[in-house]
């Protein structure tokens, strides 16, 4: 590609997926420019690395670019898109450019409705500890690298494969992971679960004959598609029929201990022995994510001690059960602050379970901003059930992400439904344990009314609530 195209322009370059690809291209020697509506940490970093960054969208920003990269969030009437097309400059989707990067190395693609970012980070960390020096492009900041992307000198590139817009079907990886398949972004699949499952089958079948798909057998929908897969597979999970299986699982604060049995390995001689693993992440869902990384690493011949060391020293990913420490309360005492990207009921339930295991004797308070009216509508009942399992709640209005408001699928409706017992119609929590904030900016004030000494506060959501943890941690008290 470099002999033909040297100047590449990104519209929406500050997005997590876009900025990672841009950074790798910069490190490969391409000339990169990009635009976004606001300046953020990602745009500042790219500017320091040599990218030309424009704040705001303007046809002039395209300049002399030879290709323009967009995400599905960029509208077709964006002035830079229109300018590029008028000038006959190719306008390509982010996934197409990611696919081009994967041509340069052996691709390892991590797919699934939930857990992609953490699993991608675990795979990259284990391969790095095994001296394979991978390139990676991740949907969150890998804390040990201080970035969401890195150009390695090794033969492998580890990336997230996005099913939300079916763009993972643009990729041709040599190895794959599927963490789970769940009903989300169903507009892409005409609200048909069979279409979603078929897309994952197609994704797996894109591997070459020498590839391997590492699949979570604990997930019912993943299990359902296995009979339709002809490519080599490894099954992982806690189930008895898993090839990479965890047993003797126990929580120890924010760490998990477990034993791994590896029953099937195709590439490296004798069957490996069991591993006694300490994972520096909480929750059963993260045990499964670690098993996926162990499956990939074992296939590639990474030594046992490197696997054990990488998992025990894993420093986490930004906004995935990210711990901010203890924050003072104005009323006296302190609370523990944790931030998480979870915005689907399944993700929220997994984070809640992890927090219960890590802090069994403490009150769990949720500050939540729902994300998208369509998701709130489609998963309304599931959201309500998860919200009922927290000890206290502060909710705010839905982050629209460009969607129009849907009656009955708003934050206040969620709050009202979550506070009533289905059987008795009585209130579940007293008024001192709940609050509704009209905006994220109002949440600190409402939290000050709800929080008590010793509480664990979990901020959750994929929208503007991402700024709340920094606000709380920088304040003298709440």
From Swiss-Prot:
GO terms for biological process: cell division; cell wall organization; peptidoglycan biosynthetic process; regulation of cell shape. ATP binds at residues 112-118. The keyword RNA-binding does not apply. GO terms for molecular function: ATP binding; UDP-N-acetylmuramate-L-alanine ligase activity. Pathway: Cell wall biogenesis; peptidoglycan biosynthesis. InterPro entries: Mur-like_cat_sf (IPR036565), Mur_ligase_C (IPR004101), Mur_ligase_C_dom_sf (IPR036615), Mur_ligase_cen (IPR013221), Mur_ligase_N (IPR000713), MurCDEF_pg_biosynth (IPR050061), UDP-N-AcMur_Ala_ligase_MurC (IPR005758). It is found in: Cytoplasm. It comes from the Bacteria. It is an enzyme of class 6 (ligase). One of its GO terms (cellular component) is cytoplasm. Its EC number is 6.3.2.8. Keywords: ATP-binding, Cell cycle, Cell division, Cell shape, Cell wall biogenesis/degradation, Cytoplasm, Ligase, Nucleotide-binding, Peptidoglycan synthesis. The keyword ATP-binding applies. It catalyses: UDP-N-acetyl-alpha-D-muramate + L-alanine + ATP = UDP-N-acetyl-alpha-D-muramoyl-L-alanine + ADP + phosphate + H(+). Belongs to the MurCDEF family. Cell wall formation. This is UDP-N-acetylmuramate--L-alanine ligase.
């Amino acid at each position: 590609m470099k002999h033909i195209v040297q100047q590449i322009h990104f519209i929406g370059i500050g997005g997590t997926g876009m900025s990672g690809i841009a950074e790798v291209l910069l490190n490969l020697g391409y000339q990169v420019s990009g635009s976004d509506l606001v300046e953020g940490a990602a745009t500042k970093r790219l500017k320091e690395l040599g990218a030309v960054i424009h704040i705001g969208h303007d046809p002039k920003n395209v300049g002399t670019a030879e290709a323009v990269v967009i995400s599905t969030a960029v509208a077709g009437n964006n002035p830079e898109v229109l300018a590029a097309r008028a000038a006959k400059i190719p306008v390509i989707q982010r996934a197409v450019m990611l696919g081009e990067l994967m041509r340069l190395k052996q691709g390892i693609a991590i797919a699934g409705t939930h857990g992609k970012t953490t699993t991608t980070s675990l795979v990259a960390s284990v391969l790095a500890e095994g001296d394979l020096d991978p390139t990676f492009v991740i949907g969150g900041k890998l804390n040990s690298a201080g970035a969401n992307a890195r150009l390695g000198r090794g033969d492998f590139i580890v990336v997230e494969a996005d099913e939300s817009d079916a763009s993972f079907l643009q990729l041709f990886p040599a190895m794959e992971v599927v963490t789970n398949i769940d009903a989300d972004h169903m507009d892409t699949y005409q609200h048909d679960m069979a279409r979603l499952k078929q897309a994952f089958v197609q994704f797996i079948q894109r591997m070459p004959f020498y590839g391997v798909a590492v699949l979570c057998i604990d997930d019912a929908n993943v299990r359902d598609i296995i009979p339709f897969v002809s490519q080599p597979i490894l099954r992982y999970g806690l189930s008895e029929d898993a090839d990479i299986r965890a047993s003797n699982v126990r929580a120890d604060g924010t760490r998990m201990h477990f034993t791994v049995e590896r029953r099937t390995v195709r590439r490296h001689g004798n069957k490996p022995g069991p591993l006694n693993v300490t994972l520096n992440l909480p929750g059963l869902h993260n045990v499964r994510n670690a098993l996926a990384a162990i499956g990939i690493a074992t296939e590639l011949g990474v030594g046992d001690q490197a696997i054990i060391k990488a998992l025990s020293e894993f420093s986490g990913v930004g906004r995935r059960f990210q711990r901010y420490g203890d924050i003072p309360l104005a009323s006296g005492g302190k609370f523990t602050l944790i931030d998480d990207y979870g915005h689907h009921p399944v993700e929220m339930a997994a984070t809640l379970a992890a927090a219960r295991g890590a802090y069994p004797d403490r009150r769990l308070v949720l500050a939540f901003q729902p994300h998208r009216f369509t998701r709130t509508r489609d998963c309304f009942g599931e959201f309500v059930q998860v919200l009922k399992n927290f000890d206290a709640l502060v909710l705010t209005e839905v982050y629209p992400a460009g969607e129009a408001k849907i009656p009955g699928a708003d934050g206040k409706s969620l709050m009202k439904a979550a506070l009533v017992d289905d059987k008795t119609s009585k209130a579940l929590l007293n008024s001192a344990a709940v609050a509704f904030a009209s905006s994220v900016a109002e949440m600190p004030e409402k939290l000050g009314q709800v929080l008590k000494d010793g509480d664990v506060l979990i901020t959750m959501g994929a929208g503007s609530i991402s700024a709340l943890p920094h606000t709380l941690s920088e304040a003298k008290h709440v």
